[in-house]
Amino acid sequence: MHTMKKWLKISIEANPLMVEVVSDYLVGIHGAGVDLAADKDENPAGQIVAFIEQAELSTADAEKCATQISVFLAEMAAVFNVASPSLVWEFLEEEDWSKNWKEHFVPFTIVPGLIIAPTWENYEAQGDELVIEMDPGMAFGTGHHATTSLSLSYLQDVVTQRGAKTVLDVGCGTGILVMGAVLFGAERGLGIDNCPDAVAAASNNVVHNHLAEKIDIGITPLSELREEYDLVVANIIHDVLASMVLELYSRVKKEGHLILSGLLADQQVDSIIEIFAREGFVLLEKGIEGEWGAVLLQKR
């Protein structure tokens, strides 16, 4: 007898500025499939719907999960200085629902030459295409992940055109950036995150994509690392990046590169450029996509 899948459906209404960071959190930490009720241009409320598979339909477990998410939402609302989002949850138990849901998520190009494909798709690369297989979320959930695509675009440039061989991904989440760097040609990568669940998710993704020989994932704090890297990337948020300026400076080789993303355009982008310039970084490029920005810096 085939057992029906059990799901916890969580519906969130958030400020549009929070949609991307909340989507990434739900995927990276809770293994959720994330869908948006509408395109952000038509959906100013920023509605996010997440589906989390459950072993059992336990009200206590659901409330614990919802509370954990609510705490994160309140923290992020404070960071973005917006109203705290609302959250409601319900159980779903449907045999065919996940199959229908998977139809939303198809392989797509996140930057030229790099395809993100869901793990169930068995996507075959065409020509010189590079492929990262991941379940929905980091790239699938919103379809808008500007911070990810901006970071990958700069990674592609620094690895393929500027010769970076070693890469550090700070706050690696699902590991998409460090995996992209190695696929572009970097010889070795390290991804670190202070969340054990994110480290577990990234580690699984690295193994699934057969990159474990070149990529290490760990929970070691940035302050405890001693190696210098050709390229460091940090896709986090402005205030955290600003607080890490000295530690990030110490991890970049002289003449090496630093990619910072997760910044709101334009004020936060200009602010972070100024903060890092004071410590000896020179701006090479600034990218804006919608409400988000990223910068490519070089250590002099």
UniProtKB/Swiss-Prot annotation:
What GO cellular component is one of the record's annotations?
cytoplasm
**Which NCBIfam families does UniProt cross-reference here?**
prmA
Q: What class of enzyme is it?
A: transferase
The UniProt catalytic activity note for this protein reads: L-lysyl-[protein] + 3 S-adenosyl-L-methionine = N(6),N(6),N(6)-trimethyl-L-lysyl-[protein] + 3 S-adenosyl-L-homocysteine + 3 H(+)
Where along the chain is S-adenosyl-L-methionine bound?
A: T148, G171, D193, N235
A Pfam cross-reference name: PrmA
* Gene Ontology biological process terms, A to Z: methylation
Family the UniProt entry places it in: Belongs to the methyltransferase superfamily. PrmA family.
Spell out the Gene3D superfamilies in the cross-references: Vaccinia Virus protein VP39
Q: Quick one: which gene encodes this?
A: prmA
Q: What is this protein called?
A: Ribosomal protein L11 methyltransferase
Task: Name the job this protein performs.
Answer: Methylates ribosomal protein L11.
Under InterPro entries, the record lists: Ribosomal_L11_MeTrfase_PrmA (IPR050078), Ribosomal_PrmA_MeTrfase (IPR004498), SAM-dependent_MTases_sf (IPR029063)
